[in-house]
């Protein structure tokens, strides 16, 4: 085969954060230490105490 160098581990950027609930890497909300993707946040926001103002 040949030499194979594994990809470097990511330390910064969008590929680092994971959703705690589903493991998705896209559109993760980090504010307040949530680390939830926006889809999961919409499902659990009300029980967590977030309210819609409008």
Curated annotation (Swiss-Prot):
Q: Which GO terms describe its cellular component?
A: cytosolic small ribosomal subunit
Q: Which InterPro entries match?
A: Ribosomal_uS14, Ribosomal_uS14_arc, Ribosomal_uS14_CS, RIbosomal_uS14_euk_arc, Ribosomal_uS14_sf
Give any single GO term for biological process. Answer: cytoplasmic translation
Sorted keywords for this record are:
Metal-binding, Ribonucleoprotein, Ribosomal protein, RNA-binding, rRNA-binding, Zinc
Gene3D superfamilies in UniProt: 30s Ribosomal Protein S14, Chain N (4.10.830.10)
Residues reported in the UniProt entry to bind Zn(2+): 19, 22, 37, 40
Tell me the cofactors it needs. Answer: Zn(2+)
PROSITE patterns referenced in this protein's UniProt entry, alphabetically: RIBOSOMAL_S14
A GO molecular function held by the record:
rRNA binding
Cofactor note text:
Binds 1 zinc ion per subunit.
Oligomeric state and interaction partners are given as: Part of the 30S ribosomal subunit.
Give the NCBIfam families listed for this entry.
PRK05766.1 (NF004424)
Q: What does this protein do?
A: Binds 16S rRNA, required for the assembly of 30S particles.
What family is this? Belongs to the universal ribosomal protein uS14 family. Zinc-binding uS14 subfamily.
Q: What is this protein called?
A: Small ribosomal subunit protein uS14
List the source organism: Sulfolobus acidocaldarius (strain ATCC 33909 / DSM 639 / JCM 8929 / NBRC 15157 / NCIMB 11770)
Task: Give the source lineage, highest ranks first.
Answer: Archaea, Thermoproteota, Thermoprotei, Sulfolobales, Sulfolobaceae
